[in-house]
Structures are given as structure tokens and as C-alpha cells.
């Protein structure tokens, strides 16, 4: 049985991926700093997890490991008074450090990148050869890590970067700051859908289980050509305008109203729905993505989920968990607000290291 180390194993994706891999005959070891370990929506998998900062991974942690799936990182921005360099530079440094250790030990390395590196895509579909135009420190960080991996690649080390589309779907540690999840949760609990933008920006979307499927394919794929393999993960059918996602949600939650935050800022008094990257109702991030390469590269790969099916599944999950507006608005399910809460209450340093021992953390 192949042993796989998953960094960021207690996050939104990691909490699904670890169980998925274990159900597909892999032995999983989790490695997570624990920022979101208490952000529980449903019962997470009982994966063996080491609660440590990814900056502290050493060669001993990689003993007996076949592949590292590197999910760990900071998943939202901007961070109020926190300096972007202090937040994101360490994630680039430790991604490169872990990759270097994998190279030395002959371990496969799979990096969780993002389609957000494309930023502004123009009228056509962007693919892996299209110029990257990252619009945020988060997406720039993803691109920089890819560049570092490309520089490390040689005949002894052939890493893989999976550029995930915007994720959606249920997770034991669900995020409600992802567009489809947010709109579905909002409609279910409040009877309203509030859009940050005018709804016209395009977004590629991918279900969390299809992300897991792509990771499994990457682990099994025989890639030894001495280069970084970059693959977009998703399906063209899930390239949707935000307004179309809202309509898919309305179809599953009949009677919910559609409103626009730019027309009435009072709609989001808690500041949870507001996307700080959207200014005056205008979101410059808009792109549609081609996923032809992953289908060509991984034999038999295709996405099983579309957005309407994912919304239907989420609504069923919300009913099963008795999701309320109070739970939906809890900061635990919004990465930016959760991190800022930990920082402002002196649990974290400016470079996002724990300041308190394990027994005093949330």
C-alpha cells in the first residue's frame, strides 16, 4: 500500500482528500498546522495527523512516503493589516523546501495550484500555455511556487502542479467563502442570494471529489520526463458566470431572492459575504479555462460533477446537518475571518506561526 503525505490535511480539501485516498487503497498521513481543526461541519476522517507547521517538515517526516500532496498554504487574501509578503513568502519557501527534500529522497511531489493564476482571460479559453496574469498575492504565490518547481525539475525529479478551478461541494470542514458554497448556504439559510459583483465575471468550477480524483490520477501517473507537468483541473461545462451559479442555486432553493451588494452594502453587516477583491461591484478576475490537457494526459479522467448536481447535493447535506443562518455565518467557515480572528486575539504571529502551546489553542 502506497503511503501518501498530505499537507493541509485538516482544511477544506484535505478533509475530503484524505478519506478519499484511504478509500482508494492508499495509506494517508496528514500534516497540518491546525488553524481550522475546530471548524467542523460534519465528522472528518480519522486520518493520522501531525499537528505542525509545514515550515517544520524534515526528512524524517518523509520516511517511507511514496508521494507528497502539498495542499498547505494560505487560501484567501487580502489580510487587513497583515503584510502580504509576511503571509505568502513563507508558503513559497516551505513549498520549495519540501519539494527539495522530495527530490533528494526520490518522492513524487504534487502541488495544489490554482486556475486563478490566469486572472484576466479575455474572450477565449485559456490553457496551460496561456500567459498568467495573477491579480492577487494568493494567485501570484501559486505561480511563483510553480516557477520554483520548474527550476527544480530534472531527470531525477518530475513534479506535477494541478491548477484547480474554484472548488465547490460538501466537506467535513466546509468553506462558505467559495462562490458556489456561499450562494447555496446563503439561499438555504436566509432565503436570499447576495452577489458581490454584477454577476458577469466568468469562473471555472470543480467539485471537491473531482479534485480528489485528479490527485489520485497524479499519484498513479508515470511522469518522469524531467519537467514540471502543469494541468488545469475541471471541465469546460463548469465554466460559468457568477449569475448562472446563482440561478442554479435558485433552482434548488425556490423562492430565494437575488440581490446585489453594490446596491445595498447593509445586506452584509457581518462582512462575511463581502469579497475585498471586488471594488464597487466590479470584479476584474474573469476567465474561462480549457481542461483538454488533463483528459489527454490522464487516461479516462473526466469530471463527474457539474454545478447544479453539486448544489443539489449540498442542499441535501445542509438539511441533514440542520444548517442554520447562525452556523452559516460562523467565522469558522470563512478562512480570512478565521485567520484574522486568531491573529487579532494573539494566537498567531504576523508571519502566522502559533504563539500559544497546543493546549491553549482553539
Regions flagged by a language model, labelled:
Residues 120, 133-160, 188-189:
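Active-site Tyr-X1-5-Lys
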Residues 7, 31, 68-71, 109-115, ...:
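SDR active-site strand-loop-helix element
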Residues 4-23:
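N-terminal Rossmann NAD(P)H-binding glycine-rich loop of SDR-like oxidoreductase domains
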Residues 114, 146-171, 181:
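Conserved beta-loop-beta element that borders a ligand/cofactor-binding pocket
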Residues 96-137:
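Conserved Rossmann-fold NAD(P)-dependent oxidoreductase catalytic core, especially the SDR/UDP-sugar
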Residues 54-90, 101-103:
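NAD(P)H-binding glycine-rich loop region in Rossmannoid oxidoreductase-like domains
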Residues 191, 196-362:
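C-terminal substrate-binding subdomain of Rossmann-fold SDR/epimerase-dehydratase oxidoreductases
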Residues 82, 86-97, 132, 136, ...:
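Glycine-rich NAD(P)-binding loop of the Rossmann-fold in SDR/ketoreductase-type enzymes
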Amino acid at each position: 500500500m502506497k503511503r501518501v503525505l498530505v499537507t493541509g490535511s485538516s482544511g477544506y480539501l484535505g478533509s475530503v482528500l484524505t478519506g478519499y485516498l484511504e478509500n482508494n487503497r492508499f495509506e494517508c498521513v496528514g500534516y497540518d498546522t491546525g488553524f481550522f481543526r475546530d471548524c467542523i461541519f460534519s465528522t472528518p476522517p480519522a486520518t493520522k495527523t501531525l499537528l505542525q507547521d509545514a515550515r517544520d517538515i524534515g526528512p524524517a517526516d518523509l520516511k517511507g512516503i511514496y508521494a507528497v500532496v502539498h495542499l498547505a498554504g494560505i487560501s484567501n487574501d487580502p489580510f487587513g493589516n497583515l503584510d502580504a509578503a509576511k503571509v505568502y513568502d513563507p508558503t513559497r519557501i516551505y513549498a520549495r523546501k519540501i519539494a527539495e527534500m522530495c527530490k533528494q529522497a526520490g518522492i513524487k511531489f504534487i502541488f495544489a495550484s490554482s486556475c486563478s493564476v490566469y486572472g484576466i482571460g479575455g474572450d477565449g479559453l485559456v490553457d496551460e500555455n496561456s500567459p498568467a496574469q495573477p491579480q492577487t498575492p494568493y494567485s501570484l504565490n501559486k505561480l511563483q511556487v510553480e516557477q520554483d518547481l520548474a527550476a527544480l525539475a530534472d531527470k531525477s525529479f518530475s513534479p506535477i502542479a494541478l491548477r484547480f478551478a474554484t472548488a465547490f461541494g460538501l466537506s467535513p470542514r466546509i468553506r462558505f467563502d467559495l462562490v458556489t458554497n456561499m450562494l447555496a448556504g446563503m439561499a438555504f439559510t436566509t432565503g436570499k442570494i447576495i452577489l458581490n459583483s454584477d454577476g458577469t465575471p466568468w469562473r471555472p468550477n470543480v467539485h471537491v471529489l473531482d479534485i480528489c480524483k485528479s490527485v489520485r490520477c497524479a499519484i498513479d501517473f508515470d511522469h518522469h520526463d524531467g519537467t514540471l507537468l502543469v494541468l488545469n483541473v475541471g471541465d469546460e461545462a463548469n465554466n460559468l458566470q457568477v449569475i448562472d451559479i446563482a440561478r442554479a442555486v435558485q433552482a434548488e432553493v425556490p423562492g430565494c431572492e437575488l440581490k446585489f451588494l453594490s446596491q445595498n452594502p447593509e445586506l452584509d453587516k457581518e462582512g462575511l459575504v463581502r469579497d475585498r477583491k471586488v471594488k464597487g461591484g466590479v470584479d476584474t478576475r474573469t476567465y474561462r479555462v480549457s481542461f483538454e490537457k488533463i483528459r489527454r494526459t490522464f487516461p479516462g479522467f473526466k469530471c463527474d460533477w457539474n454545478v447544479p448536481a453539486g448544489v443539489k447535493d449540498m442542499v441535501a447535506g445542509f438539511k441533514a446537518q440542520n444548517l442554520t443562518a447562525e452556523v452559516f455565518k460562523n467565522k469558522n467557515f470563512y478562512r480570512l475571518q478565521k485567520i484574522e480572528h486568531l491573529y487579532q486575539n494573539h494566537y498567531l504571529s504576523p508571519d502566522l506561526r502559533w504563539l500559544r502551546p497546543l493546549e491553549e489553542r482553539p
